[in-house]
Structure formats: structure tokens, C-alpha cells
Amino acid sequence: LRKEGDSPLVTLTSATRLRPQDFKTGTRIVLQYIPESGNQYESGPVRLYAAMNVQGSEVLEGTAASTDNWASHGMMIYSVNRTGEFLNIFGQGKYSTKPDFKLYIDSSTLDAEYPEVHMVFRDDNQLMSSSHIVYGSFDISSVWERPTCKGIHFYSSGINAGGYIPIMKADNPDIEPSDPDVDITI
């Protein structure tokens, strides 16, 4: 795991074994654990309390036309962050027995400095009054590693007024630190 962005990889070990029929090698998962050292984001043994599979795949290429204008059922976004080559999404959506949770790169922006990445979440509307926590982890390396990419613009119907969340590369020359001597009091 990584703490954030391109931070060093951390390896966790546990005496608790996960059942291979529930968790396949290479599958992204969420863990609930306590580090035995008491220090988060350090390699070492942990006490594992729970593990859950996470939805996700590689980012797919698409267009507004091919995705019904990025049509998505409502999902409240709690957080979006990048860890290495993965974009991780945490939110709440309607319970679904067959959720369709995908991340698309708008193919018309593939070579842009800030390609547009769209989250599409569709439920089967079986239990309309129930909601549940949703985790997704998507491999965005095919976009992130492009030479023209300085970051991405993440779009979702769960973001106010059709806005986006910018996710920038750390070495992005467009990022300038604020001047601490400038008063911006309103």
C-alpha cells in the first residue's frame, strides 16, 4: 500500500490469513487493521480485523456518446485520492446486487495536459431505499504515464454543479506555492 501519491510502498504482514476463494491475487482490497508498532504507513506486522474486495479495473476509453453522456446514478463522493498508479474513490451509493462501477478516460482528451476522467456508477435499482459504502480503485497508469499528462480532472455526478476535482502530478510546473507575505484576507 501507499499512504498517498508517490509515497514509498509499504508491506503489511499478518498472521491472519485471507481465504483464497474470497481474495484473488492482484485484487485490490480495503483492510481494517492496527499496526503492531503503533505507527501507520510503516512496513511490518499488523493485527488484521477485516478485509473487503474493492471494485475497479483499468481506466477504460470512452466518449460522451458511448456512455450516454457519462450517465451515472447518484453517488455521494467522500474522497478521491491517488496512490501510485491507482485512483481510489470512496463514497455512498444505492445498494445494488449488480453494481456497474467504472472509470472512463474521455478519449478526446487523452493527449491533453489534463485528461478528463469520468466516474460512472450504475445500480440495478432493486432495493431503492437502501444505500451502502462504495470503494473503487482504478489503475490509471495508461493515462498518468502519458508524456503530455500533468494531472487529471476527475468528473462525477456526485460533484456539485458538474465540476471536477483536479489531481495533479507533484512535479507539475503549473503548481506554484502561495506567497506567505501576500494578505488575502477578505
Regions found by a protein language model. Give the residues of each.
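First exposed extracellular module after export/assembly in secreted or surface-exposed proteins
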Residues: 1-186
